[in-house]
């Protein structure tokens, strides 16, 4: 499938030779970043912060979406309960990052697609409950295209297939500008989830798409996610002639 990358290096800063007019921003334009290599968590966090800062200071500056993979790590949302870490803090098997998103501890690793969306909800809908449900629907729509039934569970956030959670959602929002987003387990090693209570849900079962579609790879799913995000949030991808 087409893995063409429409991007500009985030390290250079979102204002580097970018001229996004109010008319473009109002049509919900966004830059799409699909790094070819696995990205350290702290690097991607820095990219998001750059765009977040610029969107807060100038609402018509570029929005951005990333679809990428991380090296193995754990992340904890604001207010996460450390009792959900099944190891001593000073003896962690993997890096642990405390970040400004909702939700409890989760696990990132290669073979899992992480989607980060830095969007100005003033250009979409200023409703966080709506936004969470839309992110879930992005994943459910992709699963439907793959012939897998994805579903929500009443009172919880995320996406399940049968009795296994395959997609997680965790967002931050400041002045109606979002950060963080979703993760979807594709063909990853799930052993790291044994070291935590995922999302604070005791006895939750975690699954991956390869449980239902043996041999499926990240490169098979990324284009579907790209189109699902674009369609759900009515985005137009801005093309930049520079690669990560």
From Swiss-Prot:
Substrate binds at residues 101-108, 168-170, 181-183. The record marks 165 as: Lowers pKa of active site Cys. Catalyzes the transfer of endogenously produced octanoic acid from octanoyl-acyl-carrier-protein onto the lipoyl domains of lipoate-dependent enzymes. Lipoyl-ACP can also act as a substrate although octanoyl-ACP is likely to be the physiological substrate. It is found in: Cytoplasm. Pathway: Protein modification; protein lipoylation via endogenous pathway; protein N(6)-(lipoyl)lysine from octanoyl-[acyl-carrier-protein]: step 1/2. Residues 9-21 have a biased composition (Polar residues). This is Octanoyltransferase. Belongs to the LipB family. Keywords: Acyltransferase, Cytoplasm, Transferase. It is an enzyme of class 2 (transferase). One of its GO terms (molecular function) is lipoyl(octanoyl) transferase activity. It holds the Pfam family LplA-B_cat. The keyword Transcription regulation does not apply. The active site is at residue 199. In the reaction, the free carboxyl group of octanoic acid is attached via an amide linkage to the epsilon-amino group of a specific lysine residue of lipoyl domains of lipoate-dependent enzymes. The keyword Thylakoid does not apply. Residues 59-244 form the BPL/LPL catalytic domain. It comes from Prochlorococcus marinus (strain NATL1A). GO terms for cellular component: cytoplasm.
């Amino acid at each position: 499938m087409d893995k063409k990358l429409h991007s500009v290096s985030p390290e250079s800063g979102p204002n580097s030779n970018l001229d996004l007019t109010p008319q473009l921003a109002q049509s919900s334009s966004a830059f799409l970043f699909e790094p070819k290599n696995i990205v350290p968590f702290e690097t991607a966090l820095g990219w998001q912060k750059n765009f977040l800062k610029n969107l807060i200071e100038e609402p018509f500056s570029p929005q951005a979406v990333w679809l990428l993979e991380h090296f193995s790590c754990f992340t904890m949302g604001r207010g996460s309960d450390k009792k959900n870490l099944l190891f001593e803090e000073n003896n962690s098997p993997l890096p642990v990052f405390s970040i400004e998103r909702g939700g409890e501890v989760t696990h990132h690793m290669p073979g899992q697609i992480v989607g980060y969306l830095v969007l100005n909800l003033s250009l979409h809908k200023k409703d966080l409950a709506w936004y969470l449900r839309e992110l879930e629907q992005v994943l459910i729509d992709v699963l439907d295209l793959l012939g897998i039934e994805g579903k929500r569970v009443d009172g919880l956030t995320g996406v399940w297939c049968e009795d296994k959670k395959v997609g997680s959602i965790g967002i931050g929002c400041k002045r109606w500008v979002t950060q963080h987003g979703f993760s979807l387990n594709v063909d990853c090693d799930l052993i790291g989830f044994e070291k935590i209570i995922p999302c604070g849900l005791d006895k939750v079962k975690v699954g991956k798409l390869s449980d239902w579609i043996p041999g499926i790879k990240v490169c098979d799913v990324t284009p579907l996610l790209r189109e699902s995000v674009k369609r759900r949030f009515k985005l137009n991808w801005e093309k930049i002639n520079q690669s990560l």
